[in-house]
């Protein structure tokens, strides 16, 4: 079986190896042909959750995508529902770059019907509203 070197970009800076590698371990469990290496972007201890953190984080995602491409990775996954830097990274490297938001919304669309979202902010990520237009369950008001 062929194997693929997959880079996972975490948009939350952490020194905790369990947290850093959590998504990569799941990917390797469900896709045994993946050899995953997870890295976090620097100086984003509050992750990417608003315009200011997006402006600071996107260039870091793109720089890490370039570095991973230069190191021979076969594909990159940006592990965040907001897909920060995904479009920009796709323009910067000639390998597949997949965002957590786009991939999840596309899978929900494939299965059809309505979809709900749960997130770290009250906002629904752009990829969800773009891909699932008209098929998102209205806000339930939890936590208000």
Where does each model-flagged region fall?
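Short, acidic/small-residue loops that bind anionic groups at enzyme active sites
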Residues: 90-111
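Short, well-structured alpha-helical segments in soluble
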Residues: 55-72
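Short, flexible loop segments at the rims of nucleotide/cofactor-binding pockets, characterized by
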Residues: 52-57, 74-76, 94-96
